[in-house]
Amino acid sequence: MDSFYRYGETTPILSGEMHYARIPHQYWRHRLQMMKGMGLNTVATYVFWNLHEVEPGKWDFSGDKNLAEYIRIVGEEVMMVILRPGPYVCAEWEFGGYPWWLQNIPGMEIRRDNTEFLKYTKKYIDRLYQEVGPLQCTKGGPIIMVQCENEFGSYVSQRKDISFEEHRSYNAKIKGQLADAGFTVPLFTSDGSWLFEGGCVAGALPTANGESDIANLKKVVNQYHGGKGPYMVAEFYPGWLSHWGEPFPQVSASEIARQTEAYLQNDVSFNFYMVHGGTNFGFTSGANYDKKRDIQPDLTSYDYDAPISEAGWITPKYDSIRSVIQKYVKYPIPTPPAPIPVIEISSIKLERVVDALLLAQSIQPVNASTPLTFEQLNQGYGYVLYTRHFNQPISGILEIPGLRDYAVVYVDGEKIGVLNRNTRTYSMEIDIPFNATLQILVENMGRINYGSEIVYNTKGIISPVTVAGKEITGGWNMYRLPMDKCPVLTEFGDNVCRN
């Protein structure tokens, strides 16, 4: 069998990746109708574990997090769903979808055959099934496929310190947890075609990411799937991700249209990653690791140069793809919906402003002899203000090699300079006078979401701070500034800056 079938009929999967959490729920239906108007019949989405389990055992599937409602709307629009629950998702998403607090659990080692880790992945998968299990096509819903893990072959190639046997055991156990939870639709894996050996798992269809060579695609799928298909490119990239300080990547519409036609001519199903990127709201954007830059934070924008722009507008790429698809599909392609009207917002005057140093004065600090990480402070995101008072003057080179990730340095409220992991700037000259306070405001710019460095993802100041080669110990105060809610500025009285 070299094709996908539904209700006994050959049904090629023409899918687009669109993540519920990156789009306000009020726009979900409009964007899905845009996908239909492009000629697609399926939507793929990751599930973000850390979005839903914000604290151990505390679950949230409301509002923009209402995955089940998103899937129901897909069904109402007569489309199919490919669910990609991870538990690891990459996705340029904070920590690859893992909850930050996993790092606080004794004995925890993520993404491997570790008892503690698998205990928590099982809880996640079982809870997810409660939300979406009834929406499988085997129960009359739109979910047609579920992915096991995610690009695990890449991780196997990067973590050669872990035995191949353990990697295989872990991958099989994640598949087993999905099945045990009650997922009965076909399972699949997705990897680069040269990484199938590490990423494939028995009983799941192997699919390739970014594979443009159709002959090679069929060859490797046949090799790992009993000499048969169906054949699918689970991530077909019409654009690419964006990092801070780097040019916006662009892929030509004509190039994508040509490749789309090649897939359609050769009975290859595909999933555009992304068809509509949306926005990394709040502190959800992730980062890559790079030896030259140490960290490459992702942007708040997840436009991805996708066929549907971040704002939800049709692009030339959208039109090019639509023109190709309509030549090959048997079903009618509807007219794309009208764009959502753009409103004009008048100027907004900020009349009450409070800076972070003043805000910290309203917060009870945590005291320690050395700086504590975000995780030790039981904080996932935002900022931490580290302060240390000096009774004697000191000057020289301030060094914070364990900075994660960006710091503004003050002495008695006066800005001295900036340290930045992204530019590998970990030191600066400093002069701290008698009876002065060193203040270091540290920002978490997003936990690494890809590669072997994902296991080193604590934030804040994670190693000793030195001045003139001397470690500064004793008397550290940490002020937690998660920025998860707006401060009540009236509480600051006359100290609030007024414009």
Predicted feature residues:
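Aromatic- and acidic-residue-enriched carbohydrate-binding clefts of CAZyme catalytic domains
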Residues: 9-11, 46-58, 63, 91-116, ...
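Substrate-binding/catalytic cleft of secreted carbohydrate-active enzymes
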Residues: 72, 83, 87-120, 126-272
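Aromatic-lined substrate-binding rim segments of carbohydrate-active enzymes
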Residues: 28-96, 100-101, 175-180
